[in-house]
């Protein structure tokens, strides 16, 4: 069972200029007290041919996390166009919103993004050198691809032998610390009370409920050595291949793109969250 369940992601500024910040209103539920913060990241896939062009746009530490339903706004800078191949600046790509606990990623949300010129003239005859100021991005917000990973939320206590604490601490910092310290934010909760049925699926906002039954939750015996399992096993290339542009408003994804997210186990009181 996942201690943290992603309930909804709302893309606030969409469509927007290519140079505008990304803004996401994220709602999640925490079932048990957490000792550490949640780390959220947004990654821009600059090329379908190589992950060398992936850009981490921003990361944010959210905590301490109270038990209940929490909400906050995640902002991230636009990608650096100098790090994107010139022939892949326009067209369809992917952004990945991920969340990790103690260095272990447990949920990933992929969105298709269509980058195109705002005017028909530029779309018909694009300049040899792309004019970034005139490019519009459109995130296909109602068709997220959600991948969940089963992780070990409560790891055994570290070795308390007097000869090993320094070594253990050093290895932990080396393997989990980000290159630069992300920003930190405290989520806020609502004071409103209400109950939901415990057997009702929690869906991503803007996604219709699937016809199939059951959940894509990995069993503990499927855990890999690092404690994670890729439930869907889909690559970024596969995400791109399934996208079909049908009009100038950003297109639509292939059938079956909508994915359900974690189902809350117990009955809880719903709380509105605010951001400090």
Curated annotation (Swiss-Prot):
Gene3D superfamilies: Histone chaperone ASF1-like. GO terms for molecular function: acetyltransferase activator activity; histone binding. It comes from the Eukaryota. This is Histone chaperone ASF1. Interacts with histone H3 and histone H4. Residues 208-260 have a biased composition (Acidic residues). The keyword Nucleotide-binding does not apply.
